[in-house]
Curated annotation (Swiss-Prot):
Organism: Rickettsia peacockii (strain Rustic)
Biological process annotations from GO: glutaminyl-tRNAGln biosynthesis via transamidation; regulation of translational fidelity; translation
Enzyme Commission number(s): 6.3.5.-
Pfam families: GatC
Matching Gene3D superfamilies: Glu-tRNAGln amidotransferase C subunit, N-terminal domain
Lineage of the organism: Bacteria, Pseudomonadati, Pseudomonadota, Alphaproteobacteria, Rickettsiales
Function of the molecule: Allows the formation of correctly charged Asn-tRNA(Asn) or Gln-tRNA(Gln) through the transamidation of misacylated Asp-tRNA(Asn) or Glu-tRNA(Gln) in organisms which lack either or both of asparaginyl-tRNA or glutaminyl-tRNA synthetases. The reaction takes place in the presence of glutamine and ATP through an activated phospho-Asp-tRNA(Asn) or phospho-Glu-tRNA(Gln).
Keyword annotations from UniProtKB, A to Z: ATP-binding, Ligase, Nucleotide-binding, Protein biosynthesis
Gene: gatC
Catalytic activity field: L-glutamyl-tRNA(Gln) + L-glutamine + ATP + H2O = L-glutaminyl-tRNA(Gln) + L-glutamate + ADP + phosphate + H(+); L-aspartyl-tRNA(Asn) + L-glutamine + ATP + H2O = L-asparaginyl-tRNA(Asn) + L-glutamate + ADP + phosphate + 2 H(+)
Family: Belongs to the GatC family.
Name the record gives this protein: Aspartyl/glutamyl-tRNA(Asn/Gln) amidotransferase subunit C
Length: 100
């Protein structure tokens, strides 16, 4: 159980501001949370192995395969307009100026 002064200090450290009518509600809720944490701390967990996942299934991995990832020729085949040939040569999309 925490005191009202401790609750006010925690609120100040967390930069929380409460009106006088809501500080009591904050104190009550914080006390309840701290009581729940105390209950959890009483549980003996020394014989329980930590979980890395909630289901014990192993992930099926695929074999790594080296593939060509150069899609630039396919991308630049879709370029149209006056600058299409230049875009294919320099491998940049040429767009109209949008910022002055």
């Amino acid at each position: 159980m925490i005191t009202k002064e401790e609750a006010q200090k925690i609120a100040k450290l967390a930069r929380l501001k409460f009106e006088e009518d809501t500080i009591e509600k904050f104190f009550t809720q914080l006390s309840t949370i701290m009581d729940m944490i105390d209950i959890l701390n009483e549980i003996d967990c020394k014989d329980i192995e930590p979980l890395t996942s909630v289901c014990n299934m192993n992930a099926r991995m695929r074999e790594d395969a080296v593939t060509s990832s150069d899609l630039s020729s396919e991308l630049f085949d879709n370029v149209s307009g006056n600058s299409a040939q230049l875009a294919k040569e320099v491998k940049y999309f040429i767009t109209p100026k949008v910022v002055e």
